[in-house]
Amino acid sequence: MDLVRQLNDRLLFAVPKKGRLYEKSVALLNGADILFHRSHRLDIALSTSTPVALIFLPAADIPTFVGEGRCDLGITGVDQVRESGVNVELLQDLDFGRCQLQVQVPAGGPYSQPEQLIGKTIVTSFTRLAREYFARLEGVDEAAMTTRVKYVGGSVEAACALGVADAIVDLVESGETMRAAGLTPIGTVLSTSAHLICSPNPKSSLALLDTVRARIEGVLAAQHYVYCTYNAHADALPALLRITPGRRAPTISKLDDDNWYAVSSMIIRREKGRILDDLKASGAEDIMVFEISNCRV
């Protein structure tokens, strides 16, 4: 009862309780300084650094808890949001958990286009999305479609080999599992990734919601950028600033030598190698790059 009473004044944040989404979500929360200790026997953890309570749930249940206002925020995949049919706000793409919800058929079999599966049997754990997809292919309402969609909760990739289905609809990340099962993709139902979602009727204060969102955005921005500094002669400065314009503008400081300047700028992480090469070729000296652990942009 003490734990339940402590939830009253906290923002309730639904987080996947296991798997890769759990691991990535916890790393994101730690980066945002939403620190907590979770007992192995409990699916609720109180943050020790912020007025937030973390509620650990199956990823498929999170849209319902958030959509009905039982939790204020949540982390789950767009696939789970669309499958649930619940009204939630997609606040932020978290840039992990990227995969495709694909139509897969036995490799070398008679099917090469999803239209060839009209009237056949499809097995999936995403029945809502599969029905919508095949109803569009047939050009009819779901009630009138001839394609049969059956629910299976796990090991969907085995359905074709066991003769349960002509095709499956399942999430695919690298495709290795499907290839090992002798399956090949012939259509994509949905591209998905983990998102920060918000209830349409949050009970927590808007100020706290905005603070948590800003912290998470800061962690994501820090993952995309690094901090670059270098020294530049006045003659080379204009060309160098074109290479490192910064998010808004670079920071330029005059050195004791009248002809030299120190320049600092955020640069895109994935372009770091090219930018450093260009800086060196254009006359920059003493070039250094630093990691950014967090920021507000």
UniProtKB/Swiss-Prot annotation:
SS bonds (residue pairs): none
GO terms of molecular function: ATP binding; ATP phosphoribosyltransferase activity; magnesium ion binding
EC number: 2.4.2.17
Annotated pathway: Amino-acid biosynthesis; L-histidine biosynthesis; L-histidine from 5-phospho-alpha-D-ribose 1-diphosphate: step 1/9
UniProt GO cellular component terms: cytoplasm
Annotated signal peptide: none
Domain of life: Eukaryota
Catalytic activity reported: 1-(5-phospho-beta-D-ribosyl)-ATP + diphosphate = 5-phospho-alpha-D-ribose 1-diphosphate + ATP
Location relative to the cell: Cytoplasm
Biological process annotations from GO: L-histidine biosynthetic process
Keywords from the UniProt entry: Amino-acid biosynthesis, ATP-binding, Cytoplasm, Glycosyltransferase, Histidine biosynthesis, Nucleotide-binding, Transferase
Function: Catalyzes the condensation of ATP and 5-phosphoribose 1-diphosphate to form N'-(5'-phosphoribosyl)-ATP (PR-ATP). Has a crucial role in the pathway because the rate of histidine biosynthesis seems to be controlled primarily by regulation of the enzymatic activity.
Family in the record: Belongs to the ATP phosphoribosyltransferase family.
Protein name: ATP phosphoribosyltransferase
Organism name: Eremothecium gossypii (strain ATCC 10895 / CBS 109.51 / FGSC 9923 / NRRL Y-1056) (Yeast)
Organism lineage string: Eukaryota, Fungi, Dikarya, Ascomycota, Saccharomycotina
Gene label: HIS1
